[in-house]
Amino acid sequence: MWMFSWLCAILIILAIAGMNTIAKTTPHTKFTKKSEEREMPKGLKPSSGPPPEEEETLFTEMAEMAEPITKPSALDSVFGTATLSPFENFTLDPADFFLNCCDCCSPVPGQKGEPGETGQPGPKGEAGNLGIPGPPGVVGPQGPRGYKGEKGLKGERGDQGVPGYPGKPGAQGEPGPKGDKGNIGLGGVKGQKGSKGDTCGNCTKGEKGDQGAMGSPGLHGGPGAKGEKGEMGEKGEMGDKGCCGDSGERGGKGQKGEGGMKGEKGSKGDSGMEGKSGRNGLPGAKGDPGIKGEKGELGPPGLLGPTGPKGDIGNKGVRGPTGKKGSRGFKGSKGELARVPRSAFSAGLSKPFPPPNIPIKFEKILYNDQGNYSPVTGKFNCSIPGTYVFSYHITVRGRPARISLVAQNKKQFKSRETLYGQEIDQASLLVILKLSAGDQVWLEVSKDWNGVYVSAEDDSIFTGFLLYPEETSGISP
């Protein structure tokens, strides 16, 4: 019975729904304006009744923008029972109003539609802010023991240790075999010939100037220093023999005249012809001295007399005019080379381990032509002041050696060679010193540091030579 009532109720509901569908069907609306073909907004669903106020406002704006058309809008297929624009064409028969009164009521929400298709992924969003760092993790367990590493590089050499005490001197060794004779050294290269000095282009010798006028006699000066002996003059030619004059008449006795100046000593006259012997006459009265005769011609030069005292210095004469250029003289003879002072020596040690704190005697002379080095004292004596070069090459064996170069009574340079056992080494030095005449230079070793050695196979040599002498003028050598 109850099932029948349910079936009746279902049929009634279906009938009412069918009638409602028929009542909503209206004739096609007439359009006076062409509506723009727009896509229906998303979310807008077809409705069976008049659109709500929001939709009415939207449709009104769309209707104002549309143009008149003769074809119905494509939206009619969406809204099958309603017209979008204009709304004055919406009609409902009075007979159907009763059945359509449900349109006045609030629409009942329909069933939930199926979910739409998944949209395209949106653009990538901006990176978010850095998050707060998390707490530190728990300490993990200790890892397994690693493999053994490779061997490291060799370390640097350590500092030299403190030298030990010197050992006792060893026993005298046996003399070694005699060495072979060395080859003859090569001769030095011959020096180049010096260039000829430049001649003075404008240094012409002028002619001798004219003798100046004789100056007025000066005041009487004191006796000058004794002059140098003059050179002997050339022998003059002998003058012609004069004619024998006539004998004058005997004059009367004149008045006694004043004493005349002493005349120069004349040369001895020629011997006259032997006259005839006269008769012995009576002695006549003494006649008066005659008038002084004229000075005779200068006779031949007499013998060179003693040098007289130096005369007074006359006034300086006027400088004569420059003479004409003289002819070029003959080329002079080749001059002698300037003598260069020399001083050098080179000597070797003849006995090993010389006494300490005294000059080492290098008795094996290699060169000492000037004799400035003394093998007896072991010292070099400076005889030429200047700059010298000194050097030594010492063989050291069996013990340390501390060698000092002494100059001007002061240890100028020191060197040390540390050696022990039977090892052999060399110590050398080269130095330049400025010495004065009388300075001495030598080598010496300190106590307990005497390892200076020499043998048939090893030498120890001391050498020195003059580099250049001291300047004696304003021009350097």
Swiss-Prot record:
Residues the record lists as 5-hydroxylysine modifications: 178, 310
Compartment(s) of residence: Secreted, Extracellular space, Extracellular matrix
Residue runs in coiled coils: none
Chain positions found as Hydroxyproline: 133, 136, 163, 166, 169, 223, 283, 301
UniProt-annotated stretches for the region Disordered: 28-55, 111-337
Positions of the Collagen-like domain: 116-175, 209-268, 278-337
Domain C1q: residue ranges: 338-473
GO molecular function, one term: extracellular matrix structural constituent conferring tensile strength
GO biological process, one term: protein homooligomerization
One CC-aspect GO term: collagen trimer
PROSITE patterns reported in the protein's UniProt record: C1Q
Signal peptide, first to last residue: 1-23
Alphabetical keyword list: Calcium, Collagen, Disulfide bond, Extracellular matrix, Glycoprotein, Hydroxylation, Metal-binding, Repeat, Secreted, Signal
Low complexity bias locations: 298-310
Comp. bias regions, Gly residues: 182-191
Oligomer and partners: Homooligomer; disulfide-linked; probably forms homotrimers. Interacts with OC90. Interacts with CBLN1.
Domain comment as written in the entry: The C1q domain mediates calcium-binding.
Function of the protein: Collagen-like protein specifically expressed in the inner ear, which provides an organic scaffold for otoconia, a calcium carbonate structure in the saccule and utricle of the ear. Acts as a scaffold for biomineralization: sequesters calcium and forms interconnecting fibrils between otoconia that are incorporated into the calcium crystal structure. Together with OC90, modulates calcite crystal morphology and growth kinetics.
Family: Belongs to the OTOL1 family.
PANTHER family: C1Q DOMAIN-CONTAINING PROTEIN, EMILIN ELASTIN MICROFIBRIL INTERFACE-LOCATED PROTEIN ELASTIN MICROFIBRIL INTERFACER
Annotated protein name in UniProt: Otolin-1
